[in-house]
Amino acid sequence: MDVAESPELDPHSPEDEEQPALSDDDILRESGSEQDLDGAGERASDLEEEENATRVQSQEETRSDEEDRASEPKSQDQDSEAHELSRGPAGSPCEEGDDVEEDGTSDLRDEASSVTRELDEHELDYDEEVPEEPAPAAQEEEAEKAGAEEEEEKGEGAPGEEGKPDVQSVGEQEPTEAAKEKKKEDDDGEIDDGEIDDDDLEEGEVKDPSDRKVRPRPTCRFFMKGNCTWGMSCRFIHPGVNDKGNYSLITKAEPFPPNGAPPLGPHPLMPANPWGGPVVDEILPPPPPEPPTESAWERGLRHAKEVLKKATIRKEQEPDFEEKRFTVTIGEDDREFDKENEVFRDWNSRVPRDVRDTTLEPYADPYYDYEIERFWRGGQYENFRVQYTEAEPYHNYRERERERERENRQRERERERERDRERERRQRERERERERERDKERQRRKEEWERERAKRDEKDRQHRDRDRDKDREKDKEKPKPRSPQPPSRQAEPPKKESTSVGPQVKRADEWKDPWRRSKSPKKKLGVSVSPSRARRRRKTSASSASASNSSRSSSRSSSYSGSGSSRSRSRSSSYSSYSSRSSRHSSFSGSRSRSRSFSSSPSPSPTPSPHRPPVRTKGEPAPPPGKAGEKSIKKPAPPPAPPQATKTTAPGPEPAKPGDLREARRKERQTRTPPRRRTLSGSGSGSGSSYSGSSSRSRSLSVSSVSSVSSATSSSSSVHSVDSDDMYADLASPVSSASSRSPTPAQTKKERGKSKKEDGVREEKRRRDPSAQPPKSSKAPAGGKASQQAAAPQPAVPGQPQQGSFVAHKEIKLTLLNKAADKGSRKRYEPSDKDRQSPPAKKANLSPDRGSRDRKSGGRMGSPKPERQRGQNAKAPAAPADRKRPLSPQSKGSSKVTSVPGKATDTATAGTKSGKASTLSRREELLKQLKAVEDAIARKRAKIPGKV
């Protein structure tokens, strides 16, 4: 125990110099810095004082230091123990050198005891460290360090107080140890090995973060000396080694920058450390502190960057990249969902290349390279071995990878392009197939419709002929026969058919109007009005069709014909807007050509009228006066018809003179016109009215012939429907629609052809019938004029009948109007003239029969027999029934009765009777009409494509 030993262990001067930084003391001490201990005694006392100060400082420091050092207490304790042990022996020499060796021995004894005490405490530390209060732990550690040094100092410095040293050193050591013990008790739970020190935390309990995180972790002084036995598990920072983990994120306020040069300084000293060996083993001298390769973190970053780069390159290179991103195809989807395995997908291509390249690259062991590349490239699995293996080869690898990636990308792009092309091709083919199928469908439908139309046309022709014959007979018989007439008319329809057939062949009707407008220029020999009538007819037809479209969505065909009509007839479109409009339009178109005055008056009023009419009709059924009665009361029309009938009746039999007919018509029109004026604007002049009536009638008739035939029927069947229904009933009502449409193209043509005159008469008659003129129809003169007047009023009525119909069945009125319009359209060329002039006489003769027949045939067209009856009923009863019972279908009987010009009452009664009887038959007829309408629609559709 010579002083020689003491100098090596003597910490005095180092401590004096580096009390703030004890780690340096340790380092100096360990490095064997020797300092004379001659004044050690005095120094010792000073040092002890200093050490006390230091202890306080160090304690404060530790308090401010991180708690995270929990693991260090052990290392420090160990270190301090080691120091004390080594110092213990050395201490005595110091003391000896100073004065008293006994003191030294006592000091040694004391030191030994203190050491044992310390060891005990340390042992406790090892076993019981609980992470209770990191700060105290840190303090404790530093305190321990300080204590160890102080103890050493005390051991060595005791001589300064010669006699007291033992006591003093022991006393001081004890206080130090007491402090340490206190600290250790605090620390007892300090965790070693960097465990989390919240073992004693209750669930959810959190330590005050200010304690742990605010305080930077101090560097480990013992590690700096190379003494730290804790290695990686040390709580304190070992600059190059354990400062990389989670702890590195905590800001360090230590004197040494964690990665700064100072930390590196101590390493050379490490080997000198007796304790260095184990430390080195544990630490594995921070394997080149940062293997030049990358940490997982860096690798992830790099991978992300690469992916980004690749993506941008792809965007630049692939024009369709954006589209591809959005196009979802199975192939691409698979790729999307398969992303995690994408890295391996190309491995097959990659591996062989790797093997091929192996010779060129020293590190390219195909297997390991493959592995590295795979893991590195994919960045899927973190293969940390890569760090060590990859450092060099990685760059070659990268280049090779880049090439490979480029190739793969190109290949992918090509594949994608191929796929896109395939997809487009397939789509195009699919579309083509669909087109082909659609065309086939269209063809099939067209053919079916054509076939159906042909069949229906035949039936319609027969029905029409039968209806015409019956109508004629019943017209002759007058209303009474007429009510029964439906059968006779049905029987007669053959005549009609023959008539229609003959005219059809001769007439321009042969041309099937895509809109199913009946062209009956030949029908009415008087062609003067025919152009306007034709126009009106078209318009009316269009309006009927359009109206039926608007009023009935059920009739698709009507939409076709309607739209077609609307195209061809500007009015049609308005017409289609609604029955009221359609009435207005029919009035307009009829009026236009014939007498605008009438047109204007009916038009405006009818429009409101159609909606009003229901009221008016009910009220106005009384106003049977001429057109007003008819118009406003197409349902009430029978009463107007009776006045007309009276006039017509006056003209007498069918053979009534054309002039008479015209006069009667004019009178009727005038008569009606007042009502019309009431209902409408009342802007029809007698002649204007008659003309307007004629033209309107022609138009209505023309629609009527096509529409009206079905319309008359429809009117009876449609009585329940609104005017628009009637109007459109021809087109829309199953029966009327069928008759007006499916038959209409054929019927219109056939009817127009067969008996365009008849149709005109019939339609006029129908108008008359609705206006109670069908009976007059029987009387040729009155019938003709009445028909015309009725027709004219009906054109006006198209508005008003709608009114009346609206009251009873707007549709019925409309139907009547449409019928009138049909007549008008059929007559446009001839019928209006016929109605107005000699043709009216002919019409008068034919009109009753034809009107009845037309109505019936219209009905028959859709549902021949019911419709004929309806047609008849609809004609007269439509008005009376409309007046009296808007809902009751125009009774067939009533229609016939109504036909009786003079029997408005009869008509009304008949209408009532018919209404009752009709309701059932009407329902049936309506159903039939519906079917007919659909059929007609189908036919029309089939026809329209062919025609158009």
UniProtKB/Swiss-Prot annotation:
The modification N6-acetyllysine is found at K810. SMART domains: ZnF_C3H1. It is found in: Nucleus. This is Zinc finger CCCH domain-containing protein 18. It comes from Mus musculus (Mouse). Residues 70-86, 106-120, 177-186, 204-213, 392-480, 506-516, 657-666, 756-770, 820-837 have a biased composition (Basic and acidic residues). Residues 395-460, 916-945 form a coiled coil. Keywords: Acetylation, Coiled coil, Isopeptide bond, Metal-binding, Methylation, Nucleus, Phosphoprotein, Ubl conjugation, Zinc, Zinc-finger. The keyword Zinc applies. The modification Phosphothreonine is found at T105. Residues 541-602, 688-721, 732-746, 774-804, 902-919 have a biased composition (Low complexity). The modification N-acetylmethionine is found at M1. Signal peptide: none annotated. Transmembrane segments: none annotated. A zinc finger (C3H1-type) spans 215-241. One of its GO terms (cellular component) is nucleus. Residues 15-25, 95-105, 121-132, 139-154, 187-203 have a biased composition (Acidic residues). Its main location: nucleus. Residues 888-898 have a biased composition (Polar residues). Residues 603-612 have a biased composition (Pro residues).
